[in-house]
Regions:
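Solvent-exposed loop/turn and edge beta-strand elements of beta-rich ligand-binding domains
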Residues: 1-279, 283-285
């Protein structure tokens, strides 16, 4: 009497899921290769339907490779697996990660650099103020969702609803404000506090951090925004006393009421210095 023992064929189940939520994913194009690089099987993942491969060789190493990731995901690194000698179903899981957004704002403004005396003849004094562009610190922004920011798996709860506040950022000593690890999507930014001496930029700015492709792990928005400095305009209307008759030929002088300094704290114009002067001055306080 001779007994023949029959080996059961190996069975492997392969699933594709979201690394964070564990939800199984549709649309991933996958390939299994043997150790020589030959294609053993190819298919497209279907949600809640693990792909089954039978009769792989026990003890041989195989490679599960993602050729195309589902929309909204990054392509996963290869997964290597070896089949054991068992009739039980062996499971292999490949997890996909989602890209994240990085918002970087470089805030600039004009700073007084130097003052040049243009003319000093025939009683006339005039100065030229020259400015340089530099970084603005302590400028604060609120970041909002410009649309419903949805989870890539299509099942999990939305990250943010339209117009929901995402967070607040403030520029550092280098004029940089940034927010990272944002879910892919569209946002807008509002300036809520600006640096001393500058005009608040009240217009919302829109930022597109939408999904790019399966090979871009960080979607970056990096832009320079500039604030206008506050400016002063002086207009003098000379009238005759007790009447509204406008008088021509009035002569005025404009003086500093405090030391004028540059961004480094260096005094460029001392207090009570004439900025604009044509003969007899009438002092104006600004």
């Amino acid at each position: 009497l001779k007994t023949v023992k029959k080996n059961q064929p190996t069975t492997v189940e392969i699933t594709k899921s979201d690394v964070t939520t564990g939800v199984e994913l549709d649309g991933a194009k996958l390939t299994v290769l043997d150790r020589e690089g030959n294609v053993v099987d190819q298919w497209t993942s279907v949600k809640d339907q693990p792909h089954v491969i039978k009769r792989l060789t026990v003890g041989e190493e195989y490679t599960l490779r993602e050729e195309i990731a589902p929309y909204g995901y990054l392509k996963a690194t290869d997964v290597k697996f070896t089949l054991e000698d068992t009739a039980e179903i062996q499971k292999v899981e490949m997890k996909d990660e989602v890209p994240t957004g990085l918002l970087i704002i470089n805030k600039n403004g004009e700073f007084l650099d130097k003052v040049t005396l243009l003319d000093h003849v025939k009683g006339t004094v005039e100065h030229l103020f020259e400015y340089v562009t530099g970084s603005l610190t302590d400028v604060t922004f609120d970041v909002f969702a410009a649309e419903d920011i949805k989870a890539a798996d299509g099942v999990s709860e939305d990250y943010f609803k339209t117009d929901e506040k995402v967070g607040t950022i403030t520029t550092d000593s280098n004029g940089i404000a940034q927010m990272d690890n944002l879910p892919a999507g569209k946002y807008y930014v509002k300036e809520v506090k600006t640096a001393h001496g500058y005009v608040l930029d009240g217009e919302p700015r829109y930022v597109d951090l939408s999904y790019r492709d399966q090979d871009t792990p960080v979607i970056t928005y990096d832009e320079k925004w500039q604030n206008a400095r506050q400016k002063v305009k002086v207009t003098v209307l000379k009238k005759e006393k007790d009447t509204d008759r406008v008088l021509a030929g009035g002569v005025f002088g404009l003086y500093t009421s405090e030391n004028i300094k540059n961004a480094k704290g260096e005094v460029l114009l001392e207090k009570d210095l004439s900025l604009i002067h044509i003969s007899e001055p009438t002092r104006l306080q600004l």
